[in-house]
Amino acid sequence: MSSNVLDTLYSIILDRISNKKEGSYTVKLLEKGKPYIARKVGEEATEVIVASLSEGRERFISEVADLIYHLFVLMAVEGVKPEDVYEELKRRMK
């Protein structure tokens, strides 16, 4: 996955935060608050584990995408940019 795709996803999430697009799932998550979003990240992580063990490649990919999306929403709420995570990963590769 290109980091460009991830950056675009994060930009869309930030736009939803700023513009509160009606009917947006991201806006609905934000309205429920940080604790709810954090629980969704945990739920999606569990679904990734289950999919990896018993549901096949396609389902696994779908669940990973869900996890990344929800994690990015939580990151946006926390004020953490993808670049911050990229830098931490680079630091760990030394």
Swiss-Prot record:
GO molecular function annotations of the record: ATP binding; phosphoribosyl-ATP diphosphatase activity
Keywords: Amino-acid biosynthesis, ATP-binding, Cytoplasm, Histidine biosynthesis, Hydrolase, Nucleotide-binding
Pathway in which this enzyme or protein is active: Amino-acid biosynthesis; L-histidine biosynthesis; L-histidine from 5-phospho-alpha-D-ribose 1-diphosphate: step 2/9
Transmembrane segments: none
Cellular compartments annotated: Cytoplasm
GO cellular component, one term: cytoplasm
Source organism of this protein record: Sulfurisphaera tokodaii (strain DSM 16993 / JCM 10545 / NBRC 100140 / 7)
The keyword Cytoplasm is annotated on this UniProt entry: yes
Presence of keyword Amino-acid biosynthesis: yes
Gene: hisE
Main location: cytoplasm
Protein's UniProt name: Phosphoribosyl-ATP pyrophosphatase
Pfam families, alphabetized: PRA-PH (PF01503)
Family: Belongs to the PRA-PH family.
E.C. no: 3.6.1.31
Reactions catalysed according to its record: 1-(5-phospho-beta-D-ribosyl)-ATP + H2O = 1-(5-phospho-beta-D-ribosyl)-5'-AMP + diphosphate + H(+)
Gene3D superfamilies to which the protein is assigned, alphabetical: MazG-like
GO biological process: L-histidine biosynthetic process
